[in-house]
Structure formats: C-alpha cells, structure tokens
C-alpha cells in the first residue's frame, strides 16, 4: 500500500512539491491539515468536544485532541477534509455548515517527528448526544466534553487538573460512560497561540449567538 503523499510548502506558504508523509514529518516540512472543533453551550457555559487518540497513533498517542482532524493529501482542498468528520465520528456534515477560522500554523515536536502544520481550522456547533457518535476505533478511543473556562484555567496553571465527561470504548468496542481526571499533560501540546486563537474564536461565536 502506497504511503500517503502530501503537498509541501516553504516558510512563505508557497507550494514547493509533494513528499511522502513519513518524510514530511522526519524533515519537518510544512504541510496542510484539516481541523474541526465541535462545541456546544450549556447553561451559558461553553464546552468543547475532545477526542481521545488511539494508543497506537504514531504521534501523541492516548492524549486528548481536536474533535476531528487529518492531513490533506496532495492536490486536496480544505473542503475535502470534511470527510474526517464522517470517518472519525460518523457525523455527516456539509463543508458549508462549518465556520471557518482560517489557517493557523502549529508546530509540534515528538520523538523522531517534527510536525509543521498549516491548519485549515473550522468550528461546528453541535449538541448531538455522545451516544449517537460512531467513532473510528482504529483512530479514536473516546469522546469527552471539556469545559472551556476550566480548560483555560488548566492551561494557565491556575488549577492542576479538571474533570472531563464522556465515554471510552471497552475492549469489545462498546462505549462506557466515564468521568475522567485530566491534567495539562493529558492534552496534545499544540502551540499556545493555536489554542488561544481557537478558544477566542469559540467565545466570540457563542457571544454573537447569545446576542441575536
């Protein structure tokens, strides 16, 4: 099976070629990804939906991460990334329903990997019950609603841990409801500016909706 091929870019964002995914990560080349954050507002409090990454993932296994995300393959456009919502979550959404935030650059370093992403980032407000999601077991092992105010306090170092509520898949693939204690180290270490831009955008959208 041929390895995924990704478009690569220079520091200025100009397309410079195509490279295999493993080489892109090994060499630290800029490439495009699709990110979609699902959120909801409950009793005037914003909650964001995080996925728990599969323990066999090559980057940041077992950590809490963006609701749905994936690489854009060579020649693909941001609209093609909407497939990730269907594949990872079983959620059928049109690209036009997503709220675009633009491109946010994000650099993460892990053992043997330099991940330099140009993230086409989107928001989607959705209050679908967690039990109605059909997650991709090879990629995701659970989903958790996370309080945004508490998460900001956690990332700022004001609290050491917080409780997140959701489900984990059991060994036979059945979802089991769970309240889990999470520390900052349990979240994928996206750059501070990345999280700040996403959180600020969610708060603006929620405030605008409340004022309508």
PLM regions with names:
Residues 23-35, 44-88, 158:
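Conserved Nudix-box catalytic region and its N-terminal flanking loop in Nudix hydrolases
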Residues 38-40, 52, 123-125:
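Short, well-ordered beta-strand micro-motif
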Residues 1-43:
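Acidic, metal-coordinating catalytic segment for phosphate/diphosphate chemistry
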Residues 68, 102-109, 113-212:
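Nudix hydrolase/Nudix homology domain
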Residues 92-102:
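A short coil-to-beta-strand element that immediately follows conserved catalytic motifs
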């Amino acid at each position: 099976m041929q390895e995924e091929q990704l478009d690569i870019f220079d520091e200025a964002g100009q397309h410079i070629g195509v490279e295999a995914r493993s080489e892109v990560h090994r060499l630290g080349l800029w490439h495009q990804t699709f990110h979609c954050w699902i959120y909801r507002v409950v009793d005037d409090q914003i909650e964001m939906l995080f996925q728990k990454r599969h323990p066999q993932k090559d980057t940041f296994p077992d950590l809490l991460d963006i609701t749905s995300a994936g690489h854009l393959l060579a020649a693909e456009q941001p609209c093609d990334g909407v497939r990730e919502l269907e594949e990872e979550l079983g959620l059928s959404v049109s690209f036009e329903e997503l709220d675009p935030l633009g491109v946010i650059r994000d650099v993460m370093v892990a053992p043997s990997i330099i991940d330099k992403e140009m993230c086409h980032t989107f928001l989607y407000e959705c209050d679908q019950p967690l039990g109605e999601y059909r997650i991709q077991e090879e990629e995701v092992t659970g989903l958790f609603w996370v309080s945004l105010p508490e998460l900001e306090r956690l990332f700022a170092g004001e609290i050491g841990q917080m409780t997140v509520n959701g489900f984990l898949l059991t060994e036979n693939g059945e979802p089991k409801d769970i309240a889990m204690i999470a520390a900052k180290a349990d979240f994928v270490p996206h750059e501070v500016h990345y999280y700040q831009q996403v959180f600020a955008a969610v708060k603006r959208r929620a405030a605008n909706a409340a004022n309508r």
